[in-house]
Design a protein with these regions (language model features):
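Metallocofactor- and cofactor-centric catalytic cores in central/energy metabolism, strongly enriched
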Residues: 2-3, 9-19, 23, 28-40, ...
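A charged, amphipathic alpha-helical module
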Residues: 2-28, 136, 140, 144-266, ...
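Acidic/His-rich segments in extracytoplasmic proteins that coordinate ligands and/or metal ions
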Residues: 76-148
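C-terminal hydrophobic structural anchor segments
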Residues: 292-339
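Short, charged, surface-exposed secondary-structure boundary motifs
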Residues: 58-67, 126-131, 260-267, 353-355
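Redox- and metal-dependent alpha/beta enzyme cores, enriched for Fe-S-associated oxidoreductases
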Residues: 35-36, 40-53, 232-304
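Peripheral docking tails and interdomain loops at the edges
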Residues: 2, 329-370
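Glycine-rich, highly charged phosphate/nucleotide-binding loops
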Residues: 66-83, 290-302
Length: 370
C-alpha cells in the first residue's frame, strides 16, 4: 500500500516531471484550468488532459495583467504560464465558470502566446434543453480548436473515453467511501490521492486507485480520530494538511472542487456521446460555481456530515473566491440549525505563515472533543 501512496505522492508533487514523461513518449498535453472542463473530449482526440490549478508561487508578472483582488489560484496559473512552467503544452482550456476565469483567458492570449487558449463557455441555466444545447455548442468549439492542433474526433472515440472516465469516477467515489473508514490515511495522503489525478492519465490513475481500495478494504482500520467534513475549492496546501494531521483530524468526506466534486456525476454511455457529455454537465450540482436557485449544496454538506458521523465541518475559503464566499453564509446557517460545529480558515497560494490557521484549528479541535 505504501508503494502506491508513494507513487501518487510523486505524481502530485511533481507535475512537471509527469508532463515531461508524457512529452517524451510523444504525447501532446492539453492543460485544463479549474473547475470543470470536457476532459473526455480532450482524451478522445488523442491528447493527455493535465490539470492547471496554479501553484504556491510568488506573484510577479501576473500582477501586470490581474488586479490584486483576483483569486490566487488563477493568478498563479497565469504566473506559471508566463514563467515557462507549462512549456510544451499544446493548449490550455479555460472555462467560463466564474468572473475571474472569464477574464483570464484574454490575458492568457497576450501573456502566454506560446500556449493557445481554448475557451469553453458554459450556460448558467444548464438543465433545460436550451442549456444542454448551449453546452454542446461550447464543446463543438473545443473540438474545432483541438482539430487545428492535430486531434481527430469521432462519437465512437468519445464514447470510449466516457467509459474510461466513468470508471475513474467510480473508483474515486469508492476510495472516498473507503477512506472514511481508515483514519490512518493522513490528510496529506488523501490530498495526494486526489491531486495526482490531475497529472496522470485516467487509465494509469484508476489502476493505482483500484489496487489501493483493495488493500485498504483488506486492512483493519486504526483507532478513530476526530471525523470532519472539509469544504472548499482547493485544500492541497502541505502546511494545512500537516496541521490537520497534527490535530488528529480525519477527513471522512469532502466537498472540495479539486477533489470529490470532480467525480460525482457520470456521463451517460450512449452512441450520441457528445449529447451525453452535454447532459452530464446539466446533471451536475452541489458546487459554488454551478447555478442552483435552491442551493442543494448546503443540504448535501449537512446530510453527508451526518451520514459519515462527522463531528464538524471545516470550510477552507480561498481568498477572493466570490462563489465560495456567497455560499458560506448559507452553509454556516445550515450547520448551526443542524447543531453541527463549523469553522472557517482562509487560504491562498501565497501563504507562508499558517499560525492563524493553526490557532483556529486548535480551538476547533477542542470544541469537537467536548
Amino acid at each position: 500500500m505504501n508503494e502506491i501512496l508513494n507513487k501518487l505522492h510523486e505524481a502530485a508533487a511533481s507535475p512537471r516531471a509527469q508532463m515531461d514523461g508524457y512529452l517524451a513518449q510523444g504525447k501532446k498535453i492539453v492543460l485544463c484550468a479549474p473547475v470543470y472542463t470536457p476532459e473526455e473530449i480532450i482524451h478522445a482526440m488523442g491528447f493527455v488532459p493535465m490539470g492547471a490549478w496554479g501553484g504556491d508561487v510568488a506573484l510577479n508578472r501576473a500582477k501586470e495583467y490581474c488586479p490584486a483582488f483576483l483569486c490566487a489560484i488563477v493568478q498563479s496559473m497565469l504566473e506559471l504560464g508566463i514563467n515557462g512552467a507549462y512549456d510544451g503544452a499544446s493548449a490550455i482550456v479555460i472555462p467560463s465558470l466564474c468572473d475571474t476565469l472569464k477574464t483570464v483567458g484574454e490575458n492568457w492570449k497576450y501573456a502566454v502566446p506560446s500556449i493557445p487558449f481554448i475557451p469553453v463557455t458554459y450556460p448558467q441555466n444548464r438543465k433545460p434543453a436550451y442549456g444542454v444545447a448551449y453546452t454542446k455548442a461550447g464543446y463543438e468549439r473545443v473540438i474545432r480548436d483541438l482539430e487545428k492542433l492535430g486531434g481527430t474526433f469521432s462519437e465512437e472515440k468519445l464514447l470510449d473515453s466516457i467509459k474510461v472516465y466513468n470508471r475513474h469516477n467510480a473508483a474515486m467515489r469508492k476510495v472516498d467511501e473507503v477512506l472514511a473508514k481508515h483514519p490512518e490515511i493522513t490528510a496529506a495522503q488523501r490530498s495526494d490521492i486526489f491531486k495526482s489525478a490531475f497529472f496522470m492519465t485516467k487509465e494509469e490513475h484508476t489502476a493505482l486507485v483500484e489496487v489501493l481500495i483493495e488493500k485498504l478494504e483488506a486492512k483493519n482500520p486504526a483507532a478513530e480520530k476526530l471525523p470532519i467534513v472539509i469544504s472548499g475549492i482547493l485544500t492541497d496546501a502541505p502546511a494545512l494538511n500537516a496541521i490537520l494531521d497534527e490535530m488528529d483530524m480525519h477527513i471522512v468526506a469532502d466537498d472540495v472542487a479539486a477533489q470529490s466534486r470532480q467525480y460525482r456525476t457520470d456521463a451517460p454511455e450512449r452512441a450520441d456521446a457528445l449529447n451525453a457529455l452535454a447532459e452530464k454537465f446539466a446533471n451536475m450540482d452541489n458546487c459554488s460555481v454551478l447555478y442552483n436557485q435552491d442551493k442543494p449544496r448546503v443540504k448535501w454538506i449537512v446530510d453527508t456530515a451526518k451520514a459519515r458521523n462527522a463531528k464538524g465541518v471545516l470550510v477552507v475559503l480561498t481568498k477572493f473566491c466570490d462563489p465560495e464566499e456567497f455560499d458560506y453564509v448559507m452553509i454556516k446557517k445550515a450547520c448551526e440549525a443542524a447543531d453541527l460545529p463549523l469553522t472557517l480558515v482562509e487560504v491562498d497560494r501565497q501563504m507562508v505563515r499558517f499560525e492563524q490557521v493553526r490557532t483556529n484549528l486548535e480551538t476547533f479541535r477542542d470544541l469537537l472533543k467536548m
